[in-house]
Amino acid sequence: MRSFHDCLPRDGAAKIISLISHITLLNEEKEPNALSLIKDAAFAIIAGDCMGAYKLYHDCARRLLLSPARRVSGDMFMDHLIWLAVEREHAFAKSSARGELDEALLMSFRSDLAALGELASLDWHDIYRMCAERYRELQAKSRYARDDISVMSSAAWTGTEPRPKPQQKDVPLPGDAAAPLPPPSESEWLSWSYGEKEPRGEYAADEVLEEIYIRLMESPDWRGMAEDLFNLFASSGSGIFLKTRLLKCAGGTLGLAAARHEAVALSVQDNAKQALGERIIAFMRGSRPLPVLIHGPKAIGKTELALSMADEFPELRAVIIEPMAGADVHRLFARLCAQPLRFMLLIENADAYSPLWSPLLCACTGGGLPDNVLPVATGTSASGMEEFVVKIAMDKLELDGFVNTVKELVEAQAPYLQADMGWIRNASVDYQLDAHDELNIPAAKLIAQRYMAEHE
């Protein structure tokens, strides 16, 4: 087929309408969306409503700017098409993540990929060109409209019978109030292009995604990517699970968790880290998940320890969870169970005696726990948590351990500084006497910050 870059305006607009109307599985359910607005703009071009097409184009551009699509290709429209096929959690992605190859979905997925691949050759300048050329066509038609005398003259010249002129609506002449308005100049159309071809940000599945992105951007036919995308979903999950290793479930809704600073390996946590690591390794190898409880004084680094361990296993995702109703817990379990990944369910500050926590804790220790979910709870006490059969104790920090922790924090954050152990010990003693507070990880971070500020 002729590309969008050199086709006639009506032909190009008709092709846009045909391709978008053809998309079934990968189109967004809610309208108006980016594709439906571009389709409406194409209808407006055919009708000669250039200003209407201009408005619809910018409505689409607004959707593209606010789209959840990752910035990858340097073109907002291409990014949106890639998002529809790869990052959006559509029916084919969900079934593939479960390891199911549904032939009907695969057939529809291939067909939609073919349409998206053709649409990927469309750029913003094509829409502008179609509008401008369509306007010129209508202007020429109105300028050279044939009257009855010209029809009879043509017939006499060619020696044929004059054909009756078809009935048609009067074409407005230039300057008439009903005449089509010219499209704005090219500089007034918001460009879809924004930069270089490179993925912005970091995704959990980037090792596989980057090759997928390159092939989609370079290939004119996306149908051949169906099997590769099936393998992506079947190994790395779908939707939000491609994006991050750290999630949060609040109110029954699973979403991205706030970014956390990379944890520093602390020697005071070595024993707890080894014990938790052994359980996670066994879990990753397919052993039955045994609920884990990490207990100890407040602010001793229990949550940071668990999250740091999750970072060490590429196929492990951490889900920070809040108290929720039993029905919400089972919906969460069903969603996690439908993914090919393994999950650490992090339950912070669990309270076995609170009715708010009861549905979640019961679900984590009952028979409905999925095989790919490992509950890890943190708390100040092991009382009432008998069902969490693996218990890891973390002791409170004594002065020597606290001083060493401050030293390790300084060395990790400012390796160019030499830690003055005398200064650190004196500051630690002063803090303990002045604040009358426990020596804990936040206090160690505070003193480390003071040391770096004074010695830099």
Sequence positions of predicted segments:
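Walker A/P-loop nucleotide-binding motif
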Residues: G286-A306
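Conserved nucleotide-binding/hydrolysis micro-motifs of P-loop NTPases
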Residues: A325-A327, D351-Y353, T380-G384, K396-F402
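Conserved catalytic/switch belt of AAA+ P-loop NTPases
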Residues: F333-A338, L346, D351-G384
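C-terminal alpha-helical "lid" subdomain
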Residues: E386-E456
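A conserved segment at the C-terminal end of the G1
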Residues: L307-D311
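AAA+/P-loop NTPase substrate/partner-engagement loops
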Residues: D270, E312-L341, Y353
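AAA+ P-loop ATPase mechanoenzymes
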Residues: R2-S267, N271, S428, D434
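Pre-Walker A (pre-P-loop) alpha-helix and adjacent loop at the N terminus of AAA/AAA+ ATPase modules
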Residues: A258-V292
